[in-house]
From Swiss-Prot:
Disulfide links within the chain: none
Assembly with partners or alone: Homodimer.
BP-aspect Gene Ontology terms: protein folding
Pfam annotation, one family: GrpE
Statement: the UniProt record of this protein carries the keyword Transcription: no
Function of the molecule: Participates actively in the response to hyperosmotic and heat shock by preventing the aggregation of stress-denatured proteins, in association with DnaK and GrpE. It is the nucleotide exchange factor for DnaK and may function as a thermosensor. Unfolded proteins bind initially to DnaJ; upon interaction with the DnaJ-bound protein, DnaK hydrolyzes its bound ATP, resulting in the formation of a stable complex. GrpE releases ADP from DnaK; ATP binding to DnaK triggers the release of the substrate protein, thus completing the reaction cycle.
Keyword Metal-binding attributed: no
Keywords: Chaperone, Cytoplasm, Stress response
Gene Ontology CC annotation, any one: cytoplasm
Family matches, as InterPro entries: GrpE, GrpE_coiled_coil, GrpE_head
Name listed for the protein in its UniProt record: Protein GrpE
Family under the similarity heading: Belongs to the GrpE family.
Amino acid sequence: MTEELKNKKINKKYYSQNRNKTKAEFQKADIKKNQYLNLKTKLNNVLLEVQNLKELNETLKKELKSEKQLNLAEISNLTKKYNQKELETKKYGASNLAKDLIQPLEILKKVVNAPNNNEVVQAYVKGFEMIINQINNVLESHHIKAMNVKVGDMFDPHLHDANEAVETDEYKTNQIVGVLSDGYMIHDKVLVYAIVKVAK
C-alpha cells in the first residue's frame, strides 16, 4: 500500500470521527494531523537513512577486512622473503672470503706437490701441509669443501671448467686428463669451478 493511500485512509477515519466538532476543533485536529504526518514522514526518512548507514557500514567493514587480509598476507610474504634472505646470507655468507682464499691455497698445494729432494725444502713443505690442513678445516667448518677432482673423472660442465681439450687414446672422450686447480662447493652450490684438461 502506498503512502498516499495510507494518508487518505487516515484522513477518512479522522474526519468520520470528528464530524460533530466545531471549526476550531477541526483546525486543531488538522494541525495535529499535519504534525503527525510530518513526523511520520521524518521518521520514515530517518529509518531509511539508518538503513543506508547500516549498509554503508557493512560495506566498509568488508572492505576493511579485505584490506586487512591483504596487508597481513603482504607482511607474511615480506617476512618469508626476509627470513629466506637471512638464511641464504648465513648459508653462503663466507663465499666471497672463501673465493679470495682458494686461489692462494691452490698455489700453496702446487708448491707442496712439486717434486723436491732438498731436506730444508722438505721441512718447509711439512709446515705448508699443516697450514693447508688448517685452512681446509676452517673452510669445512663453513661448509666449503674441495671437489677432489681426479684425472680419469668424467667432465661435468656443472662442476668443471675445461681449460684445454687434449687428443689422447688413453682416455675416453670427455674424461679429465689433467687437473689445473681443484673446485670447491659451498653447501650444494659451486663456489669455484675446477679447472681441468679434457680428452677429445
